[in-house]
Design a protein with these regions (language model features):
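Beta-strand-loop-alpha-helix segment that lines the small-molecule cofactor/substrate pocket
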Residues: 1-31
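Alpha-helical elements of Rossmann-like donor-binding domains used by nucleotide-donor carbohydrate transfer enzymes
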Residues: 12, 38-41, 81, 111
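Basic phosphate/pyrophosphate-binding loop/patch that engages nucleotide-derived ligands
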Residues: 14-23, 37-51, 117, 140-145
Length: 169
């Protein structure tokens, strides 16, 4: 996460894996999580109606790193899940801002917004400078909302809220 920073490096790794009979893959562990799989199925089936927005928080206190910032360390997990929930469509706009509070030039916290062609916005907050651990992804749609809280035990990790939007005239 990421596999590498340049396409040439990726090609070399693919060739090396092919020549040695090895499997090469990026460590997007959440792609195989049963709750993420259920989230994908519910969205594909239209159970949430029109998706309005997605939020994700991956926050904790520490481990402070010197070789990478919080975005590189934490966000690949959430980005991979958000992209899969959006049918692997790439965003048409990405905005990211962050703050380096502990070490100059190494962001401890970042806020990222991604806009997709269908109007869905995804908001992502990652930080290793936060008082408590939070690993939560929320999907809000016109016919329901889902919250995936990866800090809870498995039976409680995924909660579906069936509340429709009531429009005022």
């Amino acid at each position: 996460k990421p596999l590498c920073l340049e396409q040439q490096q990726a090609s070399e790794l693919v060739n090396l894996a092919d020549s040695t009979g090895r499997i090469l893959m990026v460590g997007h562990l959440l792609q195989y999580h049963p709750c993420v799989n259920q989230l994908q199925e519910l969205i594909r089936a239209g159970d949430l109606g029109k998706i309005f927005y997605i939020t994700s928080n991956r926050l904790n206190l520490g481990k402070i790193r010197r070789e990478e910032n919080a975005l590189w360390s934490f966000a690949p997990h959430d980005i991979s899940v958000i992209l899969s929930l959006m049918g692997n469509e790439l965003p048409i706009e990405v905005h990211c801002t962050g703050g380096a509070y502990i070490q100059d030039g190494i962001a401890d916290t970042t806020l990222t917004t991604m806009l997709f062609a269908n109007g869905v916005r995804a908001h992502m907050h990652v930080s290793w400078l936060h008082p408590f651990k939070e690993q939560k992804l929320t999907v809000v749609g016109s016919d329901g909302m889902l919250v995936f809280d990866d800090t809870l035990p498995l039976p409680d990790k995924l909660v579906i809220y069936r509340r429709n939007i009531a429009w005022l005239n």
